[in-house]
């Protein structure tokens, strides 16, 4: 199949020619869909055409009169948002939802450890049996617990559902895990290795980094941009980098589209510095802690008794601000709007309350009162500004312009 002339490959998508590698993977997945197997894995790094292949797969099924129900799913809300946008753009007749919603789960916090677990809300809310094909994208994010839940759901003998996992094993793994189980335990698979999505410099540098991910240090890069300077990457001194960064965040484009630009760094400390720098440039030095219209990102799950208001790394926009007191501590009562358009009420500690908050947590910990520890901690919501993100939190996102703090990124010892 590797030697197949591309002229022999039929046109599945108008104006898009599949490579011989993509065509081979497409045929392998189609064979899987006609088999009794339950699991299949498609791997490939950025630019190898995984998304195009998914588009081709669903389009070809419909062209052949196959009306099987399909759902696109991902572990995070952020990655699911990308899938939903893609499906709408291509007019695909599919559903899109998070893995939690698909399985009828709700995230809960173990009061003894503080770990996030998944709990079945109602077996009847498990939607896996309603679909013939479940596609789990960005599967590098799927941790061991979610992997078991997905496999158990699709392994029922009374349903014909099959599950296609899609991802890149070189992406960041789940927290406290070396690699997602998806890449270790699925027998049938196809791999895309040829970069085809990018025709310019970004594709070249991404391909180089991905292929040489084990080297001890990066080579010296030089700016490489298109003739009209609209695509590519720029290497510049910090002062110039910072000046352009400020210009980008104070532009009309960013005001109209919060996904227009982001800054990526490695350490939380550097992210905090960059967020303060950008806020000051936009609003001035005397600005309040929160401003209507600002974009926030959660550091941990935001809970309200038994309900999860926002997942970790979920973004939202501030639409209302009040002052208040909770547990005799001064707080910000924030009304926010999620990316799905839902309104949520968050309780965020004001800066003067932080020492007292930490002291009370330490007291509970010293006396081993863990249920009180977690109950008190969960009364308040931990959020950050979303101008700058760590590379880990940015995974699964799509931004138009990205500023990368390379010196800070190189502090990663791995």
PLM feature spans:
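N-terminal pre-P-loop "Q-motif" helix
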Residues: 15-33
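C-terminal accessory regions
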Residues: 333-414
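Conserved alpha-helical scaffold flanking the Walker A/P-loop in AAA+ ATPase domains
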Residues: 114-128
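Charged, amphipathic alpha-helical linker segments immediately N-terminal to NTP-binding catalytic cores
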Residues: 1-16
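Conserved helicase motor core of P-loop NTPases
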Residues: 4-6, 28-38, 50, 170-351
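Short, conserved phosphate/pyrophosphate- and ester-handling motifs at nucleotide-, phospho-/glycolipid
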Residues: 22, 76, 199, 267, ...
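Conserved helicase motor core of SF1/SF2 NTP-dependent helicases
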Residues: 27, 37, 43-60, 64-70, ...
């Amino acid at each position: 199949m590797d030697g197949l002339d591309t002229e022999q490959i039929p046109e599945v998508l108008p104006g898009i020619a599949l490579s011989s590698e993509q065509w081979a993977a497409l045929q392998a997945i189609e064979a899987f869909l006609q088999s009794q197997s339950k699991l299949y894995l498609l791997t490939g790094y950025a630019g190898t055409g995984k998304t195009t292949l998914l588009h081709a797969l669903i389009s070809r099924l419909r062209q052949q009169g196959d009306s099987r129900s399909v759902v696109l799913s991902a572990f995070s809300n952020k990655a699911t948002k990308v899938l939903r946008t893609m499906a709408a753009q291509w007019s695909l007749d599919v559903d899109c939802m998070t893995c939690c919603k698909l399985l009828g789960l709700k995230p809960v916090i173990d009061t003894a450890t503080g770990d996030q677990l998944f709990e079945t809300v109602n077996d009847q809310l498990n939607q896996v049996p309603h679909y013939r094909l479940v596609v789990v994208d960005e599967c590098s994010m799927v941790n061991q617990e979610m992997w078991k839940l997905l496999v158990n759901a699709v392994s029922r003998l009374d349903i014909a559902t099959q599950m296609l996992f899609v991802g890149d094993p070189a992406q960041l793994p789940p927290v406290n895990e070396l690699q997602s189980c998806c890449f270790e335990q699925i027998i049938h698979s196809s791999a895309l290795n040829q970069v085809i999505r990018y025709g310019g410099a970004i594709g070249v540098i991404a391909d180089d980094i991905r292929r040489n991910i084990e080297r001890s240090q990066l080579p010296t890069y030089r700016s490489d941009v298109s003739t009209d300077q609209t695509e590519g990457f720029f290497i510049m001194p910090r002062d110039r980098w910072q000046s352009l960064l400020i210009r980008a965040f104070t532009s009309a484009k960013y005001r109209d589209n919060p996904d227009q630009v982001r800054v990526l760094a490695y350490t939380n400390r550097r992210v905090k510095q960059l967020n303060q720098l950008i806020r000051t440039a936009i609003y001035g030095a005397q600005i309040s802690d929160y401003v209507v219209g600002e974009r926030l990102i959660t550091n941990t799950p935001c809970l309200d008794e038994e309900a999860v208001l926002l997942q970790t790394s979920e973004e939202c926009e501030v639409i209302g601000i009040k002052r208040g007191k909770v547990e005799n501590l001064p707080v910000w009562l924030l009304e926010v709007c999620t990316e799905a358009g839902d309104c949520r009420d968050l309780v965020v500690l004001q800066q003067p309350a932080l020492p007292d908050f930490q002291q009370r947590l330490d007291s509970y910990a010293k006396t081993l009162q863990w249920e009180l520890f977690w109950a008190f901690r969960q009364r308040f919501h931990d959020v950050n500004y979303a101008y700058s993100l760590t590379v880990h939190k940015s995974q699964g996102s799509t931004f138009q312009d990205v500023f990368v703090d390379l010196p800070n990124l190189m502090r990663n010892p791995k």
